[in-house]
């Protein structure tokens, strides 16, 4: 059997809810028991009086039995000397369980076996591991078992969101060689269904979507995520469907020919296929990377190039109006570019840079080569905004290697040139037009840094936000583009291999809805910094770190992406930031490494094969001027059983698909239709499961759903409550538009965290949390906590992190010693709230809290690239109300603003089902 998961251990009895049964929590994928660290004694900040299961890390069933554990963590011994003051209230009454939504006590094994037996299911923990089926025994292996659960009596446990997707169970001998890397790891490609229906009618009956979530790169730099590179330029492709040879082809005719696993055509094996070009001797075919690895990169020969590989080109369009000078953007960005010149990829020494400054005129800069007689940069001003022209086309884009010193001199002077400006104009649309003229012959990236609404020249926009329409049906109009220039110009850019990235910093309305069209159709991204000001150290540091990471990341250039599949399957719809050049070809002037794409798959003909394959290919030029093709091949079993389809469905991939659908609906029809569609879909899935797989009605009015999809209704509720979609009259349009950009571009792990943030209880962390793991050296995070105020105790300290923003929540009754240890302050009243960085103190608790905050920001460990460094806000429960309410919107299981609580949501779904 091919390896079921890239790097994930095969799971026995996948998806059984953890925290509801006593058996083997370890098998359920929860954290291991803490390692002992030299007998270090842990401070306990929660006193004896509150030790009755009301804390965040208490068991889901409320009170734990004596010596019980939750999530594999032993009960914490209390250290002396941190007695909790008694507040007069009975601590056991502090967190009444929500009515009708209390977790059951762990049932006895016999009782559970009986219950599962009644449903025709054996308890997965009691079953022996499934033997791998032999080819002779059964042509089709047993796919994942369906484990029904009741969403009302067994509430969702946040730890389930960290489970890997259901295993991909392939028949033995599916891959040509038995390689553990033959199938694509979920890090790169995830399917919403890990068992594919053989017919369109079965897919339609399931009501589940069939789509791929594709993230071709796992990091911003090759060194952090290495895949096998095949340098010999021998690329074997199917003559008919143009698929690349991969681990799932079949060799015939003594290995001289191969049968395509997509369309069944027989092809000749190229003559040089078994020759090692480096050592100039015959090679062992069984060792070829393209036959052993699902993810490979081919160095492309000449025929894959329309023109010589383009150099990396960055053209910076910098707002130099009054707003940009006063908030410090001009000075900070100039300094940051200067300090990052060393990090910009330039291995082939062809990288070119250009600069245009923008106010009510366009200011071009001619930068001479290093060592020239006159090393001063020249500024050329063009005030014709309708037909902006290039004053001296030759000297405006300069080679970084040849002009490095003079570029640094220019960046030092740039701030001084405009420091006394009073100009409020911003002709950014005209600057984009001029920039396009400058780099269209070679292609490249236009990086816009702006603090103003473009108010004159091409693409001029007006202040159209109206607080009276926020939260009403008219609000959706504000999310539409106000000027057609931004869409039509973006398409022009795409055709000329020009990509646009927007860095937006206004404290006023900036029309992110219109401006974000440029990145959307050119493979770029919109980075939004509301209320940014360089005078706040935290703001300046965040932007500097992110922009430096942005400039250093290894992007692909002049790229196209295509997905091919087994005969009978067709890629029908594509979601993400690119231009759809033809029915199945997505064009990227620049290919970023911090975005994901969703492709919907249609079943046009009945599939007769036991396995289908889908192959993603990204043809691109590396920053070093090499033409390459990255190929990712995913094989999935097929099934005629609806139970198999449901048992192998991936809740996180499904949530990602519906996130993209919801953004499309919000921009097309409005926010209310988008929210209604999500609720209707949740009801439809629950009703379908009840009717088709749970035997119609369920006694006792439960809400049945498979264990592997238990998080889906919660993720739908969290998506409806996300900043981009939730019903509220308090959300500025720019904030909402920026959130919609994230919902349609974030890689899957970051998207799930953005929809359902992570919350960690820090005052009662397990002993090993915040310290390096003895085996891996990685910092251990505490177990995550459900996003409900019922999990928050008044004496607690919590980290809430959605990947974009972090909140450090300080309870109103936090003990003084906790404040001393973490913040170095004698009294909570002296604790400043808002954006800040934690002080670095010489004590165990401070170091561990800092380590957890930093580890929670680490996107590399989540298997994806990102430049984002979240702000940390300190929030006091009894502090500034606005900040507190903002942090509380993260608790998506609570009732807030105009949204229902999880209990109400489940009740609504149950009524509608």
Curated annotation (Swiss-Prot):
- SUPFAM superfamilies xrefs: beta-sandwich domain of Sec23/24, C-terminal, gelsolin-like domain of Sec23/24, Helical domain of Sec23/24, vWA-like, Zn-finger domain of Sec23/24
In the record, biological process GO terms are:
COPII-coated vesicle cargo loading; intracellular protein transport
Where does the UniProt annotation locate this protein? Cytoplasm; Cytoplasmic vesicle, COPII-coated vesicle membrane; Endoplasmic reticulum membrane; Golgi apparatus membrane
- Can you cite an annotated GO cellular component? COPII vesicle coat
GO terms (molecular function) for this protein are: SNARE binding; zinc ion binding
- Recite the UniProt keywords alphabetically: Cytoplasm, Cytoplasmic vesicle, Endoplasmic reticulum, ER-Golgi transport, Golgi apparatus, Membrane, Metal-binding, Protein transport, Transport, Zinc
> Would the keyword Repressor turn up in this protein's UniProt record?
no
Q: Where is this region: Disordered?
A: 1-44
Superkingdom, taxonomy of origin: Eukaryota
Bias class Low complexity marks the residues at: 1-37
Q: Where does Zn(2+) bind?
A: 238, 241, 260, 263
The family database entries (InterPro entries) matched by this protein are listed as: ADF-H/Gelsolin-like_dom_sf, Gelsolin-like_dom, Gelsolin-like_dom_sf, Sec23/24_helical_dom, Sec23/24_helical_dom_sf, Sec23/24_trunk_dom, Sec23_24_beta_S, SEC23_SEC24_subfamily
Q: Where is this region: Zinc finger-like?
A: 238-263
Pfam family for this entry, one: zf-Sec23_Sec24
How this chain sits in the membrane, per its record, is: Peripheral membrane protein
User: How does the record describe its quaternary structure?
Assistant: The COPII coat is composed of at least 5 proteins: the sec23/24 complex, the sec13/31 complex, and the protein sar1. Golgi apparatus membrane; Peripheral membrane protein; Cytoplasmic side.
**PANTHER family attached to this UniProt entry:** SEC24-RELATED PROTEIN, SECRETORY 24AB, ISOFORM A
The task this protein performs is described as: Component of the coat protein complex II (COPII) which promotes the formation of transport vesicles from the endoplasmic reticulum (ER). The coat has two main functions, the physical deformation of the endoplasmic reticulum membrane into vesicles and the selection of cargo molecules.
Q: Which family does it belong to?
A: Belongs to the SEC23/SEC24 family. SEC24 subfamily.
Q: What is this protein called?
A: Protein transport protein sec24
